[in-house]
Amino acid sequence: MIKWPWKVHETDQNAALPWDDALAIPLLVNLTAQEQARLIALAERFLQQKRLVALQGFELDALKSARIALLFCLPVLELGIEWLDGFHEVLIYPVPFVVDDEWEDDIGLVHNQRVVQSGQSWQQGPIILNWLDIQDSFDASGFNLIIHEVAHKLDMRNGDRASGIPLIPLREVASWEHDLHAAMNNIQDEIDLVGETASSIDAYAATDPAECFAVLSEYFFSAPELFAPRFPALWQRFCQFYRQDPLLRLRDNPEEDNIPTSHVH
């Protein structure tokens, strides 16, 4: 195991983290005791291997660090911590941050503008987040900044850039792409009908296949009851990729009623 110079007595530090308190958020309460224990073990390894860097006066404490690590590891609970090996630092601003964005239009002209971002990730680069939106990721609303950026990292394991198609068997790529684009078109149809703000799925999912995969990954873990019945074929593909079925966790929770069932095949 790599020993990072900024991590001294890392095992002792992680053991002292308030894991029970960190787990006490709506997103994680439906995990079984066994799943919670395995998630904590992954989160401990995550904190041993990654550096959390607080920026612009933001202050990290033990509970914040533990919750951030748990959210990073939820998507790879069944995949393994090695799926997060494409970065070493997580930079955390207190609020959404401004970046200089460069883009090329349809006729080849390059434009520069300053834009506000909630998070960013690059191939072999750090993940950048902001605490304001991380806090909004604790519930089961369909929004989760950390899962969104982790999905981009998982996506980029299949090539130099995010494409919306993660590392899956080659024989499944065409079907995955077909179902993903069908979902994008369906979301766009709803946007055209009711507008972006009234769309039941974040309108950002309709902009690009990579963003569709990332946004629907947010819904997969935090609002499966919205994702599964609307896009059942794509839901099964997500279950097969992540090797999890969050909808079954909802069904097994006695506080949830009338939850449709789904099974990983």
Curated annotation (Swiss-Prot):
Keyword presence, Hydrolase: yes
Compartments it resides in: Cytoplasm
Cofactor, free-text remark: Binds 1 zinc ion per subunit.
UniProt EC number: 3.4.11.-
Gene Ontology terms: biological process: proteolysis
Top enzyme category: hydrolase
Main subcellular location: cytoplasm
Family as reported in the entry's similarity comment: Belongs to the MtfA family.
Protein name: Mlc titration factor A
Taxonomic lineage: Bacteria, Pseudomonadati, Pseudomonadota, Gammaproteobacteria, Enterobacterales
